[in-house]
Amino acid sequence: MNLEVVVQLGSLSLIVLAGPIIVLLLASQKGNL
């Protein structure tokens, strides 16, 4: 596998993992307000 492919897969996995976490953080902030 090429390094570029590994980087792209890594960035996609990070986005997929970070997406729900960011949504939960935003929801908790709105709930506190």
Swiss-Prot record:
Location of the protein in the cell: Plastid, Chloroplast thylakoid membrane
Main location: plastid
GO biological process: photosynthesis
Membrane topology, from the record: Single-pass membrane protein
Transmembrane stretches, start-end: 5-25
Superkingdom of the organism of origin: Eukaryota
Keyword vocabulary terms for this entry: Chloroplast, Membrane, Photosynthesis, Photosystem II, Plastid, Thylakoid, Transmembrane, Transmembrane helix
This protein's record includes keyword Glycoprotein: no
GO cellular component: chloroplast thylakoid membrane; photosystem II
Role played: A core subunit of photosystem II (PSII), probably helps stabilize the reaction center.
Quaternary assembly: PSII is composed of 1 copy each of membrane proteins PsbA, PsbB, PsbC, PsbD, PsbE, PsbF, PsbH, PsbI, PsbJ, PsbK, PsbL, PsbM, PsbT, PsbX, PsbY, PsbZ, Psb30/Ycf12, peripheral proteins of the oxygen-evolving complex and a large number of cofactors. It forms dimeric complexes.
Similarity field: Belongs to the Psb30/Ycf12 family.
Full protein name: Photosystem II reaction center protein Psb30
The gene coding this protein: psb30
